[in-house]
Amino acid sequence: MKTNNDYVKTLTINELLNKDKYIIPIYQRNYAWGDDEISLLIQDLWNAKNKNNYYIGSLVIYKRGNGDLEVIDGQQRLTTLTLIMHYLKSETFVRNVSFEHRNDSDDALEDLDSDPIPDVFKNALKSIKKYWETDRTKEERMSLAEFLQENVKIIRTEVPEDTDLNHYFE
């Protein structure tokens, strides 16, 4: 039997994006973050860069029988972090987010360097590049990338396995 501590974990972004497989289910809205949300996230990272740790919010998941983690809340942030890691071309990064029953989005996320990709991903990558690089040296950008992976944390909460997901948000 799991205790409350087993359901709530604090993870670095590196741990979040390199350990488990996340599934974005069909009931989640499409990825929709635009320039405003992305610029705010990246500006928050630049502002927090000199802190020991920075908490970026939460992710709520349901663990499926096969071990995959179904994202209940936080998919916009998770997808944006995946896009940022792709942009950074981190050597340790392996894509671990999939879109269930959305082949166009899933295929695009699988190969973000291909063409064409959905405009929402293309625009997000442009925004990431713009706000990551604006008035920054290469050393500053590399330092922020390291900070993001090792010092930025997210609280991941797993709902109990007997949770009725149809009634979770009621």
Where on the chain are the PLM-derived regions?
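Glycine- and hydrophobic-rich flexible loops that cap the catalytic core of alpha/beta enzyme folds
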Residues: M1-E170
